[in-house]
Amino acid sequence: MEIRDNNKVNLCFAFDNLRKELSRPYGILFTNNKLFLDFVSKSIQQGFKVITVGDYVSRVLEENGIIPFLEVIDGKTKRSIPQRTIVKNKEYRVTNEAGKIRFEIFEIMENILKDRDGGVVFVNGEEDLLVIPVTLSADNGDIVIYGQPNAGAVVIIVNEMIRWRVRDILEKAVVKEC
């Protein structure tokens, strides 16, 4: 399914001025896969949703028998194209430019996360910054996972404090035409 409303304003949040701030992990950085997988498994057992942003972290979980509630991927890992083996019941397609977040993606992620089925969001462009709208839309206690290049996996446990931090980052972003 393609999610697109051509009547919407073509605006984005741009983060060029925040590259350094966004390059640090904003959650728990796991460098040990066993500890990471144990933590994720326990979160699922407690009834929380697992949401991944990035192809590599999604694939690591899948290869270890953990299927995220929602995966946000662009089909590339460090700009190379890996093979996908897991197919979900619900697939969505969005467009998002590198270093930006389209305004419409906030509403799209909120609607997808309200759905009981989750799925996979294929991003035409780049998914890295979509951690922001996903974190704002996830429920308290859900975990959002993204890769920290050459370091490990970052796990954000969603709560009001982390949402406040995300909103603070958004306030510093520059609004531009996409």
UniProtKB/Swiss-Prot annotation:
**Which reaction is this enzyme known to catalyze?**
3'-dephospho-CoA + GTP = GDP + CoA + H(+)
What keywords were assigned to this record? Coenzyme A biosynthesis, GTP-binding, Kinase, Nucleotide-binding, Transferase
EC number(s): the record gives 2.7.1.237
Annotated pathway: Cofactor biosynthesis; coenzyme A biosynthesis
Q: Which InterPro entries match?
A: GTP-dep_dephospho-CoA_kin (IPR007164)
Top EC class for this record: transferase
Q: Which domain of life is it from?
A: Archaea
Pfam families assigned: DUF359 (PF04019)
Gene Ontology MF: a single term: kinase activity
Amino acids binding GTP: D55, V57, D74, K76, E127
Kinase among keywords: yes
Listed under GO biological process in this entry are: coenzyme A biosynthetic process
Family per record: Belongs to the GTP-dependent DPCK family.
Q: What does this protein do?
A: Catalyzes the GTP-dependent phosphorylation of the 3'-hydroxyl group of dephosphocoenzyme A to form coenzyme A (CoA).
**Which protein are we looking at?**
GTP-dependent dephospho-CoA kinase
Organism, as annotated = Saccharolobus islandicus (strain L.S.2.15 / Lassen #1) (Sulfolobus islandicus)
